[in-house]
Amino acid sequence: MSFFSTAVSFLALPFATASYRNDLRRTLLALGADIVLALFVLVGATLVTVLPSLPAFDVVTDYRPKIPLRIYTADGALLGEFGDEHRDFTPIGEIPPVLKEALLAIEDARFYEHSGVDYRGVLRALVADLSGGFRQGASTITMQVARTFFLSREKTVKRKLTEVVLAYRIESALSKDRILELYMNQIYLGQRTHGFASAARTYFNKRLPELTLAEAAMLAGIPQNPAKHNPAVNPLRAKARQELVLKRMLQLGKITQAQHDEAVGQALTIGHRLQFEAHADHVAELVRQELHAQYQGDTYTRGFNVYTTLDKAEQNAAYDAVRRNVLAYDQRHGYRGPEAFVELPDNAEERDEAIERTLARHPGSDNLIAAVVTEVSAKRVRAEPASGDTLEIKGDGLRFAARALQANAKMDLKIRVGSVVRASQDGKGRWSISQMPEVDAAFVAINAEDGAYRALVGGFDFSRNQFNHVTRAWRQPGSSIKPFVYSAALEKGFSPATLMNDAPLSLPGGADGQPWEPRNDDGFDGPISLREALARSKNVIAVRLLQAISPPYARDYLQRFGFDAAKHPANLTMTLGSGSVTPLQMATAYAVFANGGFKVSPRLIEKITDARGNVLWQAPPPPPRQDEQRVIDARNAFIIDSMLREVVSRGTGAQASQRLARSDLAGKTGTTSDAVDGWFAGYAGNVVAVAWMGHDQPKSLGGREFGATLALPIWIDYMRQALSGKPISERKPPPGVSVVDGDWVYDEFKGDDGVKTLDVEVSPLKSIFDAIRKAFGG
């Protein structure tokens, strides 16, 4: 008897004879027995086919999620993250109730009632499918955990049976809260994020406790289909799913009508990627390389947390300073024209596709947005960025590119419909035409006492150029090397008061057999003290000084500061910066003057912890310093410091003291021949910082550009933050120095053993006065 005929017979049962009813009962009993037998056979087949192939169960009982490498500042700001899966493991007790309720409402409302498989849910889903009512998947949270950890998404009977068996095993081994904890930390939620804590940071830049009801509902709607309901990729579908979650929460009594309506109406700002709290891509890459060298493949999955020595506020100040002043330089040297051009089709859909394809090749650079021009006139430009919005640029926002808007502009300069331009927005929401700079820059700051990095910016844009100019760029230092030659001269009896002749100098060794004639930017001044010569960066005096102490001696002396002797020629051009240094070398070298004569080794990592916060490595405290560890005499460091302070107070670095209004700033500008490189290296207190600007392929930065116009503004902008609230640093003279002729000198060089003049004719009258002063002990 078929199932259909049996059903008909059952409906006719009240009208049947007693004999017929007995026959029907026997038939139904037999059918029931067949069903039971079939179920036993099915269960048996399941046990035979599924149980032997069940995967190892410790993956959930001993859960070890893949947690990425994370890098932080010393004050806990996230700098970078490396790993295939973005995940923050969060214990169930720290997950806010609103998020748990939103998730269970849409995924498994009877989670705390069933035993892993919700048969009522299966029937309800079937009825809903047939009736067109609210559709809820038949898979429970526990079944999804089984699928996520053990199985694929293939649609086979065996896979589904295995999922059911695993669900029961999971329920028997783990508590409900533990199962939910596994699910909420493991589930994929789009944008390479796994788990709700990571998704909250990625989409809303928030921690879980900070989520609103609307945001929690948005996240809870993602698991069913992360591609379809990704709010960053499909905002309309994600919104519809969010409203479904809120409707379900209302039906279950988890929220009130007022809460529902408020959440539905809340406008959400959706992020597209993980947001970091400080701009330090080059730092993050340095740390990644160091960790990978030690831990290899485990680097990106074991949840290492690396705390650097950086300060968040100072790092962001350094980043902003580099970006601001590179763009300022670029503005000074004019608009070069659009980055590219694309023909825009008349068809709207084809036009949008053309814009999207084009802008994919021109990614944004922080506040420099790439956009395709859709409308242009001399007074207004409209452009479309990757977001699909329309930017309107007018008034002062067009000034930088005014020549490119003229009707007779050259084709490679002209802005027209289809041009790819860069735009930036000011604090008042006004857009301006800008451009990606060709020049690059770098900045590094360290603690003079222990070498700890305070800030590091390896270049203008890490996504465009991963090369770390701080640690890897060997560039000519220009005049910023001069203080080290002066330091060497102090050991030979010179002092800041030593008079030298700032007059034309002709030496053999020039190009094409011609004499070499070093020059000053500001002409010649005749007899001048070394203090004045350094303050005004006199090239001829620096050459005469090196000539007096000998290039080989000076080159050997430079090694005390950490310079590589092989990269500095043992000839007179060395004093003008013809050798090669990195910005990091310059920072550690200037730290010797700042800390009284000790060489420091730069260090970046303060400590490393595992995912549970256990300390794996901690930087040892710096050992107490001993005088015998000095690389230069304390007196030498003190005197050079006094000279470098004068450079900043009234010399080539005077802009710093004027803008920062401090008397404890010390440093030196540096400009190479033809202004190929611009430098400023200096310090205040225990903060040592070096700024550099130049092209990767060396070429002139411009005829009227110097270290003071290129690098010094970066240094000033950073120091404004780094020195905020810090007292003025005073230096006390160490034992063994005296004031002679109005300036400091080593005690052993107070008399005739010191160098009073060099290449300067002393008048007879001055000789008489000197003799009288000496006779009376002056």
Regions found by a protein language model. Give the residues of each.
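Non-catalytic, structured segments within soluble enzyme domains
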Residues: 43-44, 48, 132-385, 545, ...
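N-terminal type II signal-anchor transmembrane helix
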Residues: 1-72, 110, 130
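Active-site SXXK
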Residues: 103, 249, 318, 378, ...
